[in-house]
UniProtKB/Swiss-Prot annotation:
Family, as annotated: Belongs to the WD repeat TRM82 family.
InterPro entries reported for this sequence: Trm82, WD40/YVTN_repeat-like_dom_sf, WD40_repeat_dom_sf, WD40_rpt
Domain of life: Eukaryota
Subunit structure of this chain's protein: Forms a heterodimer with the catalytic subunit TRM8.
Species this chain originates from: Candida albicans (strain SC5314 / ATCC MYA-2876) (Yeast)
Record's protein name: tRNA (guanine-N(7)-)-methyltransferase non-catalytic subunit TRM82
HAMAP family noted in UniProt: TRM82
Gene Ontology cellular-component terms listed: cytosol; nucleus; tRNA methyltransferase complex
GO BP: tRNA (guanine-N7)-methylation; tRNA modification
Length: 426
């Protein structure tokens, strides 16, 4: 059977899906009107061997060292604002990969133009508003920047690697997510225009902190957002709709909505009442930390929004939340003041690994931990009780997955966010 996709993202129009499965990056044109056979328009495989010390010692000595296996998997995937480049990271050599996207190339739309090593393994990636630099957080709490250079005349990876790159900011705790924010939509009613188009880095860590730092002068901290009790794993700004808003979630039973520049918490959405029945014993604490009254724990895997723009219909602003290792997407309707109303649960038979939104046709694409039919599509439709997401037929992109496994236990570890939760023996 096929190994499922671990990461899905789409371009703004939702015409293309970019997907990661283990050490492969694939691109699909789901707008094609023809058959499924011609929808794959790009593919790249990472064949670089790990430079982990364990691997190098084994190669030199011939002795096998019994430690946790180091895989050459791809992680994290983000498009630049102009969608001309896509950025990924590797486990094998702790590098940032920068690809040029050229849909005019009928053979392969992906061209690797830079492979930049990072001192420690990346934990999250974002892009500055000009699309000139990738901002990279690592598992040791540091943040680096990597230039996104492009020279269309180059036929190979010839861009000079940046040597001895230095962190631009740091946390004392492991960084769990990072995003960029700008103020150009925040101060329309402010007579002082000095803040217009200013950039900020927003970082989250395992210690419940959300920090807002100036960029590029990131040693200047604007403020902190305090409102979480557990780790923060997701920072989401609806850039296309309202970049003044930040939505955050992690190990708490709730997600928060902020006016990030003002440091104002404007809404808290409680999730347990909607997700409790979909939690399993896998969500209990490890045995050594478990008591008779231990609740099943919530870990937020992904947050996204979708705003409909139908001229003939009332506009909807929808918030979609994925709790890790559950077979459900929670959908909320947000009003103009960002007060949330529960809309529906999109339920499938297997745990959802990731999802992406094709905004123009109001479709959600999900990747499932399934032995068959690991991709499902849902679109927003008018029903008797209002608009709801319903399953539809979509392009069969899973047929192109190049990784075969014997059984589900051979899948790569698909759920890791729960490991961010801090434990105590006391």
């Amino acid at each position: 059977m096929k190994h499922p996709f671990q990461i899905l993202i789409t371009n703004k129009k939702g015409t293309h899906i970019f997907a990661i499965v283990k050490n492969y990056l694939q691109v699909f044109d789901i707008s094609k009107g023809g058959g499924d056979d011609d929808i794959k328009v790009g593919e790249w495989q990472d064949t670089t061997e790990s430079n982990h010390p364990k691997i190098q010692i084994e190669k030199r000595t011939g002795r096998q060292i019994s430690t946790q296996q180091i895989h050459n998997h791809l992680r994290y995937l983000i498009l630049t604002p102009d969608e001309q480049h896509i950025i990924a990271s590797t486990d094998s050599d702790k590098s940032i990969l920068i690809f040029k996207i050229d849909f005019n190339n009928s053979i392969n739309c992906l061209k690797l133009i830079k492979r930049q090593p990072i001192p420690k393994r990346p934990s999250s990636i974002t892009i500055d508003s000009q699309g000139q630099r990738a901002i990279v957080a690592d598992k040791f709490g540091d943040v680096y920047t990597v230039s996104i250079n492009d020279d269309s005349s180059m036929s190979e990876i010839e861009i000079e690697i940046e040597k001895d790159i230095q962190p631009i900011l740091g946390h004392v705790s492991m960084l769990t997510d990072i995003t960029m924010a700008t103020t150009h939509h925040n101060n329309n009613n402010n007579n002082n225009n000095n803040n217009n188009n200013k950039q900020f880095i927003i970082t989250a860590d395992r210690d419940e902190h959300i920090r807002i730092s100036n960029y590029p002068k990131s040693y200047v901290i604007k403020n902190f957002l305090f409102g979480h009790d557990e780790f923060v794993s997701q920072l989401y700004i609806p850039v296309q709709y309202d970049p003044s808003i930040l939505i955050s979630g992690g190990g708490d039973d709730f997600i928060n909505i902020w006016k990030w520049y003002e440091g104002e918490l404007i809404e808290t959405i409680q999730l347990r009442q909607y997700i409790e029945s979909y939690l399993s014993d896998d969500h209990l604490p490890p045995t050594r930390f478990r008591t008779e009254t231990s609740p099943k724990e919530i870990s937020i895997a992904k947050i996204a929004t979708l705003r409909t723009n139908d001229e003939e219909e009332e506009e909807d602003h929808l918030l979609i939340v994925l709790v890790e290792n559950t077979p459900v997407l929670l959908v909320f309707n947000l009003d103009d003041s960002y007060k949330a109303k529960y809309l529906q649960a999109i339920i499938v038979n297997d745990s959802i690994i990731d999802f992406a939104i094709a905004a123009d046709n109001k479709t959600i694409i999900t990747s499932l931990e399934s032995e068959q039919h690991s991709i499902k599509y849902f679109t927003l439709q008018e029903e008797n009780d209002g608009k709801k997401f319903s399953e539809i037929q979509g392009p069969n992109i899973e047929q192109f997955i190049p990784i075969e496994v014997e059984q589900k236990s051979d899948f790569q570890q698909l759920y890791t966010i729960f490991q961010l939760r801090k434990r105590s023996d006391s």
